[in-house]
Amino acid sequence: MSSQENIQPQELWSRISKSQRDLAKSILIGAPGGPAGYLRRASVAQLTLELGTAFFQQQQLSAAMADTFLEHLCLLDIDSEPVAARSTSIIATIGPASHSVERLKEMIKAGMNIARLNFSHGSHEYHAQSIANIREAVESFATSPLGYRPVAIALDTKGPEIRTGVLKGGPETEVELVKGSWVLVTVDPAFRTLGDAHTVWVDYPNIVKVVPVGGRIFIDDGLISLQVKKIDRKGLETQVENGGLLGSRKGVNLPGAEVDLPGLSEQDAQDLRFGVEHNVDIVFASFVRKASDVAAIRAALGPEGRTIKIISKIENHEGVKKFDEILEVSDGIMVARGDLGIEIPAEKVFLAQKMMIGRCNLAGKPVVCATQMLESMITKPRPTRAETSDVANAVLDGADCIMLSGETAKGKFPVEAVKMQHAIAREAEAAVYHRQLFEELRRAAPLSRDPTEVTAIGAVEAAFKCCAAAIIVLTKTGRSAQLLSRYRPRAAVIAVTRSAQAARQAHLCRGVFPLLYSEPPEAIWADDVDRRVQFGIESGKLRGFLRVGDLVIVVTGWRPGSGYTNIMRVLSIS
């Protein structure tokens, strides 16, 4: 996020000379003798030189000053610098390619904010070691309190999903299913670890009852398609429609079939207990279809896991249709496009993505965009141009987090994938039309008597009006930081907290830069507030958000504890 804020020239009248006012007018209305867009572009550059950099954010400045969205698009400049610091969080899946401490350190340096553990693969022992490695890698940055990088750990449940078994050669083996060949899909336990090119075991006993002759079975995000030709006591006799390489433990989709799996399996319950015991921060709940599925997960976490955030993954048609009730009881949403693109027509996935991100933005809840974002980087060092556009458009849609799956879990270039997503997000964030976005979010905000929420709206508007370089918020649970993030300030939200978990979970919220303050409380509460604010300022200077002369908005409470945030101050950095 940049350390500078955009402001409209007509708001500077009391601070600039008449010649500069005339110049500012030419920016907004054009000038005689040439195209308004060209003159606006040239005039903005001249005005910036005359006024210095204190009043304007430099990234995509001409587009940021636009009066309409179409004009904003026309004025985007490929030579403009990206934002100084990325505000969209990066979630990276940890697997064989990224399991080691050294590789995790590299990924943290590259920009990983949340580490995802996929419990569809691996044993509890394997994931316990992954958690230990992640924490060791994070602690290696703890020598400097100002440079410490809290990384959240997320447990992704298996959920009511169907998967294939293990192939004969072991978990790393792949076999090719050739188009036109015959494959037996069986539930016979004897084939659980003996799959091959002609026999595929699946872990759903009722598959022979719910898939009719003529029905289709999709494997591995739909890359492999089988059509059922015959059903007998051995299983489903199928013919390969679309072939490909089949690995172990791949996801299976049965489009159109009424799958009767429970929302929370016994395996999921065991995995959730494991997560509570190992203090994970987030649960990504797979295949959530209705609000009661979320309630079951919350109950399974128990009182010890009450502070764990539940992010519901929307992966089928039922989940999309019941989205509002799921959103209401969830802490956030993941747009899981892999399975979703099989359960609903692929050409409608973008509609579901935009709808879900928009509703999450209105509700002020985090939303993650996931699956196949940089898929080609599993085997190649550079993404396709379509993939870079996909990541950028997820950011422009309003996603709080963007996720890497196989790219970092099993890919050849896990660190490079994180770096690429980081670079794309920085460019995309510079192109967000913040002027329109904040106005729409503010208008859509319901009337509230909650002092914290009212203060958050005021702080974000003040940051726009005075061109604040950052908003520093002191928070105990992270709620104040999330409320500030809801209104998408262009300034960095520096969240100072003594809660390690709140610092880690803050990465779910766009534009929030969490700081863990580990000093003991001062005897006088006002002194303690000042010390934490100063800690935030020093960190902002270190990260490049703040410079001498910049204004910052400070949001604090009127007394110790959570739920009392209602004070806003404007400070100048000295």
Swiss-Prot record:
Write down the Gene3D superfamilies for this protein, in alphabetical order: Phosphoenolpyruvate-binding domains, PK beta-barrel domain-like, Pyruvate kinase, C-terminal domain
Q: Which residues carry this modification: Phosphoserine?
A: 2, 19, 26, 43, 292
Enzyme Commission identifier(s)? 2.7.1.40
GO cellular component labels: cytoplasm
* Class of the enzyme per the UniProt entry, highest EC level: transferase
What is the top-level taxon of the source organism?
A: Eukaryota
Q: Which residues bind beta-D-fructose 1,6-bisphosphate?
A: 475-480, 525, 532, 559-564
Q: Which keywords does the record carry? A: Allosteric enzyme, ATP-binding, Glycolysis, Kinase, Magnesium, Manganese, Metal-binding, Nucleotide-binding, Phosphoprotein, Potassium, Pyruvate, Transferase
Where is the site labelled Transition state stabilizer? 313
Pfam families in the cross-refs: PK (PF00224), PK_C (PF02887)
Q: Which amino acids does the record list as binding Mn(2+)?
A: 315, 339
Q: Supply one GO molecular-function term.
A: magnesium ion binding
Provide the GO biological process annotations: cellular response to insulin stimulus; glycolytic process
Pathway(s): Carbohydrate degradation; glycolysis; pyruvate from D-glyceraldehyde 3-phosphate: step 5/5
Residues bound to ATP are 118-121, 163, 250
Report residues binding K(+).
118, 120, 156-157
Sequence similarity: Belongs to the pyruvate kinase family.
| Subunit structure as annotated in this protein's UniProt entry | Homotetramer.
Its biological purpose: Pyruvate kinase that catalyzes the conversion of phosphoenolpyruvate to pyruvate with the synthesis of ATP, and which plays a key role in glycolysis.
Additional information: There are 4 isozymes of pyruvate kinase in mammals: L, R, M1 and M2. L type is major isozyme in the liver, R is found in red cells, M1 is the main form in muscle, heart and brain, and M2 is found in early fetal tissues.
Q: Which disease is it linked to?
A: Defects in PKLR are a cause of inherited hemolytic anemia, an autosomal recessive disease of the Basenji dog that closely resembles human pyruvate kinase deficiency.
User: Any idea what this protein is called?
Assistant: Pyruvate kinase PKLR
Q: Which organism is it from?
A: Canis lupus familiaris (Dog)
